[in-house]
Amino acid sequence: MAELRALVAVKRVIDFAVKIRVKPDKSGVVTDGVKHSMNPFCEIAVEEAVRLKEKKLVKEIIAVSCGPSQCQETIRTALAMGADRGIHVEIPGAQAESLGPLQVARVLAKLAEKEKVDLLFLGKQAIDDDCNQTGQMTAGLLDWPQGTFASQVTLEGDKVKVEREIDGGLETLRLKLPAVVTADLRLNEPRYATLPNIMKAKKKKIEVVKAGDLGVDLTSKVSVISVEEPPQRSAGVKVETTEDLVAKLKEVGRI
């Protein structure tokens, strides 16, 4: 059991506390000079892998991130939390902005095969695009079973038991390893990296590779036409009677 290896995908996103601003040309959002951090769902995925390692159920944790050189900061955070080594799939900034779930899934699938991992952990979604697709696509490319929105993960021999919340209650899945698991908010509460572990993380290895080295084509078939701010909410109008309300609703075409 202790020979299991886990690959954890971590994404660098604009920090959740930052107010998002759209570029003047509406081609995307402003990222230059903006604070970034690890996607919160990815933090949960890292934490779960580390907890399994602390229970001596996982031997090695590899953190991987796709994007520009700044992604190494995100990988260092994962290393400080307890991951053993990192892989940075270096993608230039302009190309990284158009990176979609399918392109990332192709990279992760190749790395999972190359590293011969037994578990692939991801956050269920990223807070920047909210796609909730990468884990499912990766499982499809690998032809591995998947447990999405995991709120509890238990290793049982050559299987992983995943408990997930659904509309009608809880669903329990048993997946034969290797498998893909995506983390939901209720799975755990990620730890803060301590200063000693942050210092140790600086000495841990981060391997830098190109997507081409993995034989992955990052060409996207999806193009962004325009990114716009949400419309401003218009001021409300007070009405005195029900008749006035009905008349006003008819006036604006609501009824």
From Swiss-Prot:
State a GO cellular component annotated for this protein.
Answer: mitochondrion
Single biological process term from Gene Ontology: amino acid catabolic process
Q: For the modification N6-acetyllysine, which residues carry it?
A: 200, 210, 238, 248
Q: Which residues carry this modification: N6,N6,N6-trimethyllysine?
A: 200, 203
Ranges where the record places region Recognition loop: 183-205
Q: Which PANTHER family match?
A: ELECTRON TRANSFER FLAVOPROTEIN BETA-SUBUNIT, ELECTRON TRANSFER FLAVOPROTEIN SUBUNIT BETA
Function, as annotated, reads: Heterodimeric electron transfer flavoprotein that accepts electrons from several mitochondrial dehydrogenases, including acyl-CoA dehydrogenases, glutaryl-CoA and sarcosine dehydrogenase. It transfers the electrons to the main mitochondrial respiratory chain via ETF-ubiquinone oxidoreductase. Required for normal mitochondrial fatty acid oxidation and normal amino acid metabolism. ETFB binds an AMP molecule that probably has a purely structural role.
Name of this chain's protein = Electron transfer flavoprotein subunit beta
Q: Which organism is it from?
A: Mus musculus (Mouse)
Query: Taxonomically, what lineage is the organism?
Result: Eukaryota, Metazoa, Chordata, Craniata, Vertebrata
